[in-house]
Amino acid sequence: MGTKKVNQFKDFVPTISDSEEDIPDLDASDDEYETAGKVKSRKKTKKGRKGGAVIADDEDAHADLNPEFHFNDEGAEGTTDFSGWDFVGDGERAEQKDVDLDGIIRRKGGLVQLAGVEESEEEVEEAESAAGASDDEELALDGFGMGAVAQREAAGAADESDSESDKDSDNSAEEAVELDGVEFGDEQEEAREEDTAEEMAQFYAPSNEGEEAKNVVHSTFNSLSLSRPVLKGLAALGYTKPSPIQGATIPIALLGKDVIAGAVTGSGKTAAFMIPIIERLLYKPAKIASTRVLVLTPTRELAIQVADVGKKLGKFVSGLTFGLAVGGLNLRQQEQALKLRPDIVIATPGRIIDHIRNSASFSVDSVEVLVIDEADRMLEDGFQDELNEIMSLIPSKRQTLLFSATMNSRIKQLISLSLKKPVRIMIDPPKQAANKLTQEFVRLRKREHLKPALLYHLLRKLDSTGQKRIVVFVARKEVAHRLRVILGLLGMKAGELHGSLTQEQRLQSVNNFKSLDVPVLVCTDLASRGLDIPKIEVVINYDMPKTYEIYLHRVGRTARAGREGKSVTLVGESTQERSIVKDAIKSVDGSKGSGRACGRVVDWKQVEEIHKLVQAKEDVIGEILEEEKQEKEILRAEMEIRKGENMLKFKEEINARPRRTWFQSESEKKNSSILQALSKNKKVTNSKKRKREEAQQEVGSRQYKKTQKDRTTNQELAFRKQKKGGNKKKKVRK
């Protein structure tokens, strides 16, 4: 009877008048269906014996419901408990045995208690009061005031402060004034050509399109004419009002036009391109599976984050599928997922080319939308070859969306993307930090050797309780690893994030930092772009970046989405580092926000005492690094043994696999890497010299330039003429 009933109601849509008890719940699990079947059979026997008593039972059951209960059909589930995006790759991870560095540090006496000099009772009380103030500020940020209450409390506390704090503030003000007046070396303009007005008018869409889009203010997402499933996804994430970049970009993207958009970090650029994509895919053919959207990102972590944003925004859209193609994760699992031809594929350039060339049943021939996140980074020389290859593989008739916080690429770079009259939308002035970011600078002068001790001192001052998330940026991965060991020996737990880690280790580091298991994350510029981890309070630049753009992306990890944040930068004496500080001060002076740039007062005596502790532990640091190296060698040897066993055991299957191909040969790879290295070491010229060189190129071959040999011969001739002239004068006098 049960199967008859299922077949009977399979092709019909039940109405309100139908009896729901007779219709089985096909979405329930097997266990639930068995228990439900027993209950229903009892009810049927009761119904057969007592015909009219069933109605009374139903009425009694409805009487137990609360008449004041209302369903929230806006899909607001998870609004209050939303804790950021998930950094988990697709598929189950294979268990890998890694070296337990924290265990080694504990065996050597680290990670027990915070080391340091003894502080007076007054300093401890000040630290506790500062911690309490920071807690109040965090509560204010989570409410509707978004930091306004905290600012008023801070203003009141500043008025009621004692004389000692006044002295400290005076010292910091003097330092800030001194910082403004410092000569940061000769101001060199970067070798960046500016597009002429004629070129821009010919390449871009009329400027009034972007200006009109920026001038329209949207108070809610309902005014953007979005469909109900998309609005439910936004409500589930707690999004109520579109940010300026979202309000300006979404209507134009929905029209199918190409877009080049730029806004400060943390302004919601990912949702700005993901919302119109999901809205467009609502009207796709239901029975034809094909990849219609390709999203390219420069880093793996950013790709995983973008995929999670898309899944959460489109969770109420039926039939919407996502695929992930990033390096470091299981290649076979990604192949299986891409065989199903997901609607949206988020990828890094190298891995997507690998899948296009070597994965069966996957193609990008039907791509309708191309999104390039962090476009200025993707247009640099490091990704140029891969990007050109991808452009040759996807259809030229498509919509292209470019997004970045420092979008200042020239038309020459954009031509390769085959853009069609793109609309240019720049919400904020280029090269500007977030409005509520406080930028502090510490001048090292001749104290470069004290940097590890200074970092530990700053971490203790900024967060003595370990309840804040602090990101430390360094230039090299070896430095990041060594700093993790040093901080561990001083009693502070820290994580690391750089390219030498496996992808599983990188994701684990991000998740530990996100859950506050590790309050300090020491990383390279790998984490400087796009990562959106909620409530990063402080960013410390241990090493200065190479350019001001990289500096903006680093400090953009904090003060996101209207929150307040702080960055502390250690500044050396090089001209390059001084010029970055000068650009930061100029940007703050020209902005209308509440951000500021100032110097930070440091107690160098305490730093020197901490430095003595670090020096005393140098032998232990060497022992830890050596022990870790030996354990890594053992793990590598075990892996090679397993690899050899698999080669012998599955020799036929391995040999039967087709060889994976690449679009470049080994010699071409070497040549491109050499060209990239030469371009990086290219000397920066100022604007006058560049214009002179351009004028000489337009004229053709430049005039002959004298060599050193020519100058010496000319000098000799001049001396001879002088001697001859002197002898003639003597003869005339005689």
Swiss-Prot record:
Q: Which residues fall in a compositionally biased region of kind Basic residues?
A: 39-50, 680-691, 720-734
Q: What is its main location?
A: nucleus
The EC number on file is: 3.6.4.13
Extract the Pfam families matched here.
DEAD (PF00270), Helicase_C (PF00271)
What EC class does the entry list? hydrolase
Recorded hits in SUPFAM superfamilies, A to Z, give: P-loop containing nucleoside triphosphate hydrolases
Helicase C-terminal domain mapped to chain residues: 436-599
Q: Where is the composition biased (Acidic residues)?
A: 18-34, 118-140, 171-194
Q: Catalyses which reaction?
A: ATP + H2O = ADP + phosphate + H(+)
Domain characteristics, as noted in the entry: The Q motif is unique to and characteristic of the DEAD box family of RNA helicases and controls ATP binding and hydrolysis.
Subunit note: Associates with pre-ribosomal particles.
Q: What is this protein called?
A: ATP-dependent RNA helicase DRS1
Q: In which organism is this protein found? A: Eremothecium gossypii (strain ATCC 10895 / CBS 109.51 / FGSC 9923 / NRRL Y-1056) (Yeast)
Gene label: DRS1
